[in-house]
C-alpha cells in the first residue's frame, strides 16, 4: 500500500529529516499567515522508486500520507539524478517553498490539480511554468525500488499516485 497511515512506515532517518523540514515550514507558515494544519514535503534526494512525497501533519507531528513522486525530465535529468531549474521550458523540477493555489481540472490522474506558487528565487516562475501538483494513473501505488520511476511522467510538476492525490484533495477541500 502506498499511503502511509503513520510514520511507522517511514525510515527513522527520513522521518527525522522530514521533521526538521516540517518545523522550519511551520515557522515559515506561522510568520507568513499560512495554514498550519499540514504541509507537503518532497525529498528528491530519496531514490525515485521509493516514497518521497510526504503529507506532514503538524498537529500529529508525523507523516500522514506518502507517495512516490516523479521529477521533471528536462536538462539531462536522469531517472536517478534530477536536474533542477526555474527556467520556463526547462521541464525541470524546482526546489523551494510553494504556496498551494486553486484547484482546477487536470487531464491527468484523478482529473484535478492544484496550482503551485513558488515563494523563493529557485521556484518563483512556477505559476508561469504551469507547475501544479497532480497525479498520474500509471504511477505505481507501491514502491518499485530498486527500479526508478521512468522519465517523462513530469515536465517539472510533482506528480504523485492517484490514491494519495485523492487524500490530498480531501485535506485541501476541507481547509
Question: What would you call each of these model-derived segments?
Answer:
Residues 2-155, 162-175:
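Cell wall/extracellular polymer interaction/catalysis modules
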Amino acid at each position: 500500500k502506498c499511503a502511509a497511515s503513520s510514520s511507522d512506515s517511514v525510515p527513522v532517518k527520513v522521518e527525522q529529516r522530514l521533521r526538521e523540514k516540517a518545523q522550519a515550514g511551520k515557522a515559515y507558515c506561522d510568520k507568513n499567515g499560512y495554514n498550519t494544519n499540514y504541509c507537503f514535503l518532497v525529498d528528491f534526494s530519496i531514490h525515485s522508486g521509493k516514497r518521497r512525497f510526504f503529507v506532514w501533519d503538524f498537529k500529529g507531528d508525523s507523516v500522514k500520507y506518502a507517495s512516490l513522486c516523479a521529477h521533471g525530465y528536462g536538462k539531462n535529468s536522469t531517472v536517478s539524478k534530477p536536474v533542477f531549474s526555474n527556467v520556463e521550458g526547462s521541464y525541470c523540477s524546482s526546489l523551494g517553498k510553494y504556496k498551494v493555489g486553486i484547484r482546477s481540472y487536470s487531464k491527468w490522474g484523478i482529473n484535478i490539480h492544484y496550482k503551485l506558487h513558488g515563494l523563493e528565487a529557485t521556484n518563483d516562475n512556477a505559476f508561469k511554468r504551469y507547475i501544479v501538483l497532480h497525479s498520474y494513473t500509471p504511477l505505481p501505488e507501491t514502491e518499485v525500488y530498486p527500479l526508478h520511476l521512468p522519465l517523462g511522467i513530469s515536465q517539472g510538476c510533482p506528480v504523485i499516485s492517484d490514491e494519495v492525490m485523492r487524500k490530498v484533495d480531501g485535506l485541501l477541500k476541507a481547509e
